From Swiss-Prot:
Keywords on record: Carbohydrate metabolism, Glycosyltransferase, Transferase
UniProt EC number: 2.4.99.16
A GO BP annotation: oligosaccharide catabolic process
Originating organism: Streptomyces coelicolor (strain ATCC BAA-471 / A3(2) / M145)
Top-rank taxon: Bacteria
Active site: D385, E414
Enzyme class: transferase
Position of the signal peptide: none
PANTHER family, A to Z: ALPHA-1,4-GLUCAN:MALTOSE-1-PHOSPHATE MALTOSYLTRANSFERASE, GLYCOSYL HYDROLASE FAMILY 13 CATALYTIC DOMAIN-CONTAINING PROTEIN
Gene Ontology MF annotations: alpha-amylase activity; hexosyltransferase activity
Name this polypeptide is given: Alpha-1,4-glucan:maltose-1-phosphate maltosyltransferase 2
Oligomeric form and interacting partners: Homodimer.
Presence of the UniProt keyword Transferase in the record: yes
Length: 669
């Protein structure tokens, strides 16, 4: 076997290998155990057969067993194979293509031998090929099978049809599949693959303000009082607790309730206005407690199976120590004052933005120091506030520094901005990204956006679907009431491997600051907001049971841990959306009513092969939300009524896995 160097086009052209990020200059991404497809265009001159395989090379540089590719559609020249990397680290993958002389000979022999065209010569050629192939097969892996076939091909005491048949047996096929005869092997250039821990792709997040978790006697919460909330968060099935900034808050231009410019002495300020004489980004707000209290909070979270994600907002209040120690880090106007932050139409009079170009080295060094400080106290996830308002090169440098020694640390980009910026932030190192999910509410919007996210973008960008945030209360939730909160939770939890809610979502808090605003009235950004969780549970005014069930379903179904496996199915009513995810034998099918006001019905036409089924199959589908089981085939009637059931979340079972299913489609649910 001769390996051709990849110079120019290559002897067997290997073109357009996917996934590829920025022409291979940046790695495609996966997590441990995540299966993804590698594709390439492979062809050659003339009519001789070609074949191809994928080779993964682990972080130690060891190539794994090569994975055979298949032509994705006859005559397309597009080949593909799924691969699954193991341990975290920097992998590579490449596609090898080759001329397949055995397949070429078999095609010709099946035509010529029955027709009596040079039958003896054709069989002799086949015998030579099989002997060549046998030389590359270990003795205990079927070498004798190929040698026996080669001998039979030359046995002129047998009819030519029998001699040919001896070379086409399933046993021969199996040996050649494991050890093909490969001529003119040509390899693509290796492409980089970054494999990260599972949490980079999959998890359920819960955001809350520790300062709102006080007591009747001491309204301002501490880390000690906030830790009492952790068991309930864990019981709802969340994996990550995300905290807004926990640092000292400035008093200069402090915002009052509902973003008023005149704060009273009782106003607690905005956590994102970081810094005071008590300290900056490496300090804890005195009202929250001490660093020991924070360590206790992190320990308690871990005891309940929760990771801590800490907000990292690279900005300052006018009272931050940096303002005096590092004046070069800020934009100074001609009169000597520092311009406050703006994100039109929003203004942040209590915040100074950072100027990055005067001392980029100093800023990067200080940023890394701060991040490592919190890492030393158990934080392995950072939610980065507005990274799109800082230089991309700065984040690339900082993340590379952190992940170079601590590859398990995860950075979430809170960037609601232009697509090019969001994509680039993901490509230069951010493990996760906020998305436009909040503003995608119709069937067409959701389908188009999710097909984008689960397509080529999935090679570098991992979405985090927050159903709400302290900044964003979408009109859909404002006007849709509890049914809107329910269906958006279902969508977020089943469309994206990572989803989250901000505290109060489970209580369906939906009063806006004013009509047309996406801000909350009495926003928790500006004031304490204690909630009576016990009363809500007692009176049934919480959707926490639904949230808990959704997170349980997610944990029980590996298909929901992935993004690239998302497929949509046809509905004849655009108020209903249907989609599925499949990993191995685990198949989840979701049908959701996007209209929170009215009962909707539709016929759902399933793409059965996407479910791993034949077109004529009829299988039990078990609704994981209601416990009911139905028999579904290719076309199925669905009726969903807001207030009774926001959706069906079906586990598609094999017929032997369910007992006594109800015939037909679903009734009102």
């Amino acid at each position: 076997m001769r390996m051709s160097a990849t110079v120019g086009i290559g002897r067997i052209p290997v073109r357009d290998v996917q996934p590829v990020v920025e022409y291979g200059r940046r790695p495609a991404k996966a997590v441990t155990g995540e299966t993804f497809e590698v594709t390439a265009t492979v062809f050659r001159e003339g009519h001789d057969a070609v074949a191809a395989n994928v080779v993964l090379k682990d972080p130690e540089g060891r190539p794994g067993p090569w994975t055979p590719m298949r032509e994705l559609a006859p005559g397309s020249d597009r080949w593909g194979a799924t691969v699954t990397p193991g341990a975290p680290g920097n992998w590579t993958y490449r596609v090898e293509a080759w001329s397949d002389p055995v397949a070429t000979w078999r095609h010709a022999a099946r035509i010529k031998v029955p027709a009596g065209i040079d039958a003896g010569l054709v069989l002799e050629e086949g015998s030579e090929l099989y002997r060549r192939a046998a030389a590359g097969v270990p003795k205990d892996s079927g070498r004798d099978v190929l040698l026996a076939a080669a001998t039979a091909l030359l046995d002129d005491t047998l009819p030519v049809a029998t001699r040919l048949a001896a070379a086409l047996t399933p046993q021969v096929d199996a040996v050649l599949a494991r050890h093909p005869l490969r001529d003119l092997v040509t390899s693509s250039d290796p492409l980089p693959l970054l494999v990260e821990r599972e949490r980079a792709l999959y998890g359920a997040w819960y955001e809350f303000f520790p300062r709102s978790e006080g007591t009747p006697h001491t309204p301002h919460g501490t880390f000690r009082t906030a830790a009492r909330r952790l068991p309930a968060i864990a019981a709802m099935g969340f994996d990550v607790v995300y905290l807004p900034p926990i640092h000292p808050i400035g008093t200069t231009h402090r915002k009052g309730r509902n973003n008023t410019l005149s704060a009273t002495g009782d106003d607690v300020g905005v956590p994102w206005a970081i810094g005071s004489p008590e300290g900056g980004h490496d300090s804890i707000h005195p009202a929250l407690g001490t660093l020991d209290d924070f360590d206790h909070f992190v320990t308690e979270a871990a005891r309940h199976g929760l990771e801590i994600a800490l907000d990292f907002a690279l900005q300052c209040s006018p009272d931050h120590p940096w303002v005096h120690k590092h004046p070069e880090w800020f934009h100074h106007r001609p009169d000597g004052t520092i311009a406050h932050a703006e994100n039109p139409p929003k203004k942040y009079q209590d915040i100074y933005p950072i100027a990055f170009d005067a001392d980029p080295d100093g800023l990067a060094t200080e940023t890394v120091r701060i991040l490592r400080h919190w890492m030393d106290h158990g934080v392995r996830i950072f939610r980065v506030d507005n990274p799109h308002t800082k230089p991309v090169a700065f984040w690339e440098r900082v993340i590379a520094d952190i992940n170079g020694t601590d590859p398990d640390v995860i950075f979430l980009a809170e960037a609601f901005t232009r697509p090019a910026m969001m994509a680039t932030l993901a490509q230069i190192g951010f493990q996760q990204s906020y998305t436009y999910f909040t503003w995608r509410n119709t069937k067409q919007e959701l389908t188009e956006y999710l097909e984008e996210l689960s397509g080529e973008a999935a090679a570098y960008m991992r979405p985090n679907f927050f159903a709400n945030t302290p900044d964003i209360l979408h009109a859909y939730l404002q006007h849709g009431g509890r049914p809107a909160f329910e269906v958006r939770a279902v969508l977020a939890a089943t469309l994206s491997p990572t989803w989250g809610i901000y505290s109060g979502y489970e209580l369906c808090e939906n009063t806006p600051l004013r009509e047309g605003s996406e801000e909350y009235l009495d926003s928790e950004k500006y004031q304490l907001k204690p909630r009576d969780w016990t009363r809500a549970a007692r009176e049934g005014t919480t959707i926490a049971p639904l949230v808990t069930r959704l997170n349980t379903i997610r944990r029980e179904h590996p298909a929901l841990h992935r993004l690239r496996n998302l497929r949509f199915h046809h509905t004849d009513n655009d108020a209903l959306i249907a989609y599925s995810k499949r990993v191995g034998s685990d198949v989840v099918l979701v049908v959701a009513n996007l209209d929170p006001h009215r009962t909707q019905e539709a016929t759902i036409s399933l793409d059965m092969p996407q479910l791993g089924l034949d077109w004529h199959d009829s299988v039990p589908v078990h609704d994981e939300l209601t416990g009911r089981t139905y028999h579904w085939g290719r076309a199925n009637y669905v009726r969903l009524e807001p207030g009774r059931a926001p959706a069906h979340v079906f586990h598609v079972r094999r017929p032997s896995a369910a007992a006594a299913p109800q015939n037909g489609g679903s009734g009102a649910s």
